[in-house]
A protein has these predicted regions:
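Hydrophobic alpha-helical transmembrane segments of multi-pass inner-membrane transport and secretion
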Residues: 12-41, 277-315, 336-345, 416-430, ...
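Conserved transmembrane alpha-helices of multi-pass membrane proteins
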Residues: 280-283, 331, 335-340, 358-387, ...
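Membrane transport/envelope proteins' first extracytoplasmic loop
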Residues: 1-295, 305, 351, 360, ...
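Alpha-helical membrane-protein architecture signal
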Residues: 2-3, 7, 18, 325-329, ...
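Short cytosolic juxtamembrane segments of multi-pass membrane proteins
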Residues: 393-412, 872-884
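Juxtamembrane segments of multi-pass membrane proteins
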Residues: 53-66, 437-626, 635-638, 751
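Juxtamembrane/transmembrane-helix interface segments of polytopic membrane transporters
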Residues: 39, 342, 346, 350-358, ...
Length: 884
């Protein structure tokens, strides 16, 4: 019997089975590919995180343990790529005498480096002038001492006579906060600020000068081993990689037996990334799951479109004595057939498409996702088929045969209890609760950050989507039942004299028409929200990279070797759209040394983005105008305002270094506003001023940095500019593609480009399918009505009035509602992610071209459905009557 039933399904309902299987196929394929993106993004985040770690471990030798014993323990624990000894010693001061003037710093650090450390760690040590071999001065220390390569610096040792050393190079220590972190047996909540005055010595020279201090005053000196090892042993998932990195450090601790303390830089980075990895999973699922839900709903619509026929089938089986379990098993056969076909084709399609959207090979975790997606498709198919059958079995055979007539509208249970209003209220409550606290990003000095996300925030958009759909169903059903006069006026241009008849017919079919409108709205909202959010996300990721790098291409020099003399040559270079000089100096606010950036407020935005979020009043134009109108104006950070109790319009005295004597002198400025972010600036505190005013006061007209806006690919332009700067010592060129995000890096570094392409590619057929299929299935249910109209003499034009009128209602209402819901969803998700972005977006980016294509695709789909139905109405009257 079951085999006969299966053969009958294949013979008589092949079209329905294929259509339903196609819906399951789309859902399975989308879920499987989402799994691929989740796994790939996690691996990418892990790879990016560990690639920037130098070193992985900083092992501080303590007690009686010597460096050689610790070296043996390290090599037995990990496969090392490099291991260098680094010694630290406190010094009373550094001083130099240049041109008859002596400059003396405060306390500082003298660091001993093994041979090759500086040369082999370009991310840690950036050469500005001279050579990396020999004695090196940190950039700010060199500036304070007015020292250049070849000059002599005096080191005042603790409890010993001062010594003189000859400077060989000036460097920038890129990750000084990590390099000089305090290593303790208990984890530190934040890294300490690095010392202001730093000098690096070759290891033998440091040993000769400070070995006795290391033995006699261990509290003022330390010995560390900086270790980098092979990362291939780390799993791709950040959480598992974090566990592995922690276990390796624990193994080393056991071998050292108290003889060393490890700063696990690798685990610290992965600890933050694992939070972001979970965020990306939620984000990907949130962006893609609605598409799978729409595909399943379309499958459900296909199944329910034949509900009357299925009830008659069940009635026939009931009259022939089939039991409930037998009837359900037959429905289950159909469900399994549809689910199996959809699951197999969906997984196969995902396997074909995966190499197009992701570059790396498939792994075990992705195959698990494929299996889970296939099983989910089969489960969804069982639910879609078995629930209607189970409900039908609650009726008698007669009740399943006779179409019930409802004289009065009966509100569904969800409307009576206001589930739509409840969902919307929950959405806005969660949104208010989360957005009021936001995503709290805890930043260490100089922008080392770990991001944590309140994942319940994603319940808000989910509730909004479901609640909006139900509210639309409530309101549109109400309109269709009670707005007949308005409907008649709306349809008059199409139906003409038949508008009253058509509106009355549609009003009687309000339930079916409303479901069609809601389905179209859901499909459209998925496409629109995905397009808007992903476009905004990608645009903001570029803004974040610009904030880090400064511009598309940035040339960075020093006060002694500024980049600004090359400005005219840069502007003539092919591919340069614009270029702006920017000073980067240092200024004392009280005793606090801060970065100072001198700009031309009128033209800075021509070379780099000036986001509203950069400034305290959220108005970039107004803030820059205020700075322009106040030549002595200064923008300060929130931290500085609080620390020094500043009032807008008040005077703030800064100490700047003058060219005349290389000493710091007081220069008065007027506080005109707050800067929260600025291109290339650190996160904690900095100053923005007029470059012309600083140049006039200090006698130093040059600008250390040139920001360049590119009209070609930034890496291409950067390569061209290398020819210009190759003979200029200390100038470094960086382009936006090299930018490493210092705040929230893993979050906005997640590349949504391929995921966007996938989702938008799926959204088009889903939207077209929703519009065309909903309308076509609705007309199929009305075959009897059209046959009767033909029987009583209705002309093709009159039948066309019914068809085009319903098409207008379903398409226009569904599309308009979908656009509104989609925009609202994208707005909410963007707002919820405001503090994840650095800086947050000023406005959402609307992909108008895609939305136009989306609407046009839906229009074409509904036109095809109408024309197909009109063709079917041209059959003979006898053929039409056989459909009654």
């Amino acid at each position: 019997m079951k085999m006969d039933w299966l053969k009958g399904l294949m013979r008589l309902r092949a079209g329905t089975i294929i259509a339903a299987s196609a819906g399951v196929c789309l859902a399975v394929c989308l879920l499987a590919l989402l799994g691929v993106f989740i796994v790939q993004s996690a691996s990418t985040m892990t790879a990016r995180a560990v690639s920037g770690i130098e070193p992985d471990w900083q092992v501080q030798v303590v007690g009686t343990t010597d460096a050689e014993s610790a070296d043996v323990a390290i090599h037995s624990t990990v496969k090392t790529k490099s291991l260098y000894k680094v010694d630290y010693a406190d010094v009373s001061s550094l001083s130099s005498t240049i041109d008859g003037t002596t400059q003396t710093t405060g306390v500082g650090k003298a660091v001993g480096l093994d041979e090759g450390y500086a040369n082999n760690n370009p991310r840690q040590f950036r050469l500005l002038s001279g050579s990396l071999d020999g004695v090196l001065l940190a950039q700010q220390t060199a500036s304070n001492l007015h020292a250049r390569p070849g000059d002599t610096v005096t080191i005042a040792r603790l409890g010993q006579a001062a010594i003189d050393v000859k400077v060989d190079g000036i460097i920038e220590v890129s990750n000084a906060d990590q390099f000089f972190q305090i290593i303790a047996s208990t984890p530190q909540t934040a890294l300490n600020a690095p010392p202001d005055n730093i000098i690096f010595l070759p290891a033998p020279q440091w040993e000769a000068a400070f070995a006795s201090q290391l033995d006699s005053m261990p509290q003022t000196s330390q010995r560390q081993l900086h270790v980098s090892f092979d990362h291939s042993v780390l799993p791709g998932d950040p959480t598992q990689a974090f566990v592995t990195a922690t276990e390796m450090a624990n193994s080393l601790a056991a071998k050292l037996a108290g003889g060393g303390v490890t700063a696990n830089n690798l685990a610290a980075r992965l600890d933050g990334v694992r939070q972001d990895s979970l965020f990306s999973k939620v984000l990907f699922l949130f962006l893609g799951t609605p598409g799978a839900i729409v595909a399943i709903l379309l499958t459900m619509l296909i199944v329910l479109s034949g509900s009357d026929r299925r009830k008659r089938d069940i009635a026939l089986l009931q009259m022939r004595g089939a039991s409930r379990s037998e009837i359900l098993s037959m429905s289950g056969i159909e469900a399994l057939l549809v689910g199996a076909i959809g699951a197999v084709t969906g997984v196969a399609l995902a396997a074909v498409l995966a190499p197009i959207f992701v570059s790396s090979a498939m792994n075990t975790a992705e195959y698990y996702w494929f299996a889970a997606a296939g099983l989910s498709g089969i489960f969804a198919s069982l639910v879609v088929f078995l629930i209607p059958s189970w409900l039908a079995l609650r009726n008698t055979a007669l009740e399943n045969t006779v179409q019930p007539r409802t004289l009065a509208y009966l509100a569904p249970t969800w409307q009576i209890f206001g589930i739509d209003i409840l969902l919307l209220a929950l959405a806005w409550f969660i949104f208010w609760q989360v957005s009021s606290t936001g995503y709290q990003v805890v930043a260490a000095p100089e922008g080392v950050a770990t991001a944590t996300v309140d994942y319940k925030a994603y319940a808000a958009p989910a509730f909004l989507w479901a609640g909006s759909a139900l509210l639309l169903m409530r309101l549109f059903s109400l309109f269709m039942r009670h707005g007949r006069n308005v409907l008649e006026q709306v349809l008059h241009p199409i139906a003409a004299v038949f508008s009253k008849t058509v509106s009355a017919s549609l009003s009687r079919e309000s339930g079916r028409v409303t479901k069609g409108v809601v389905m179209v709205a859901l499909a459209m909202s998925f496409a629109v929200s995905t397009a808007i959010f992903n476009t905004t996300y990608e645009n903001q990721a570029k803004v974040d990279a610009t904030l880090t790098n400064g511009a598309d291409v940035t040339i960075t020099g020093t006060t002694a070797n500024p980049a600004s003399p090359l400005l005219d040559t840069i502007l003539k270079t092919v591919g340069v759209a614009n270029a702006e000089p920017m000073q980067h100096r240092y200024a004392y606010v009280g005793n606090d040394l801060q970065d100072l950036y001198g700009i031309n407020p009128s033209t800075i935005s021509a070379a780099t983005s000036m986001s509203n979020a950069y400034f305290g009043n959220n108005d970039a134009a107004a803030t820059l105008t205020s700075l322009k109108n106040s030549p002595d104006g200064v923008l300060v950070s929130d931290e500085t305002v609080g620390d020094f109790q500043l009032k807008e319009g008040g005077v703030i005295n800064l100490r700047l270094q003058f060219a005349s004597d290389h000493a710091y002198h007081i220069v008065p400025f007027k506080f005109v506003g707050i800067a929260r972010e600025f291109p290339t600036a650190p996160k904690d505190s900095f100053l923005i001023v007029n470059a012309a005013y600083v140049a006039a006061k200090t006698g130093l007209p040059g600008s250390e940095i040139v920001l360049i806006k590119s009209s070609v690919e930034p890496p291409t332009l950067a390569a061209s500019l290398h020819d210009i700067t190759k003979n200029m010592p200390g100038l470094v060129i960086s382009d936006i593609s090299e930018a490493v995000h210092r705040l929230g890096s893993s979050l906005v570094a997640v590349d949504l480009h391929s995921l966007t392409a996938l989702e938008l590619a799926f959204a088009l057929p889903l939207a077209a399918g929703a519009v065309g299929l909903v309308f076509a299935l609705g007309l199929a249910e009305r075959r009897r009505s059209f046959a009767i109209l033909q029987a009583i003499g209705a002309t093709p034009r009159q039948l066309g009035a019914f068809l085009w009128s319903e098409a207008l209602i379903v398409y226009v209402a569904g599309t308009a509602a979908g656009l509104a819901i989609g925009w609202l969803l994208a707005w909410m998700l963007t707002k919820l992610m405001t503090q994840v972005f650095d800086p947050p977006p000023d406005v959402m980016v609307i992909p108008w071209s895609y939305i136009a294509i989306l609407c046009l695709t839906g229009l074409i789909a509904v036109c095809i459905a109408v024309l197909f139905q009109l063709r079917k109405t041209s059959v003979s009257l006898s053929t039409a009557m056989r459909t009654i």
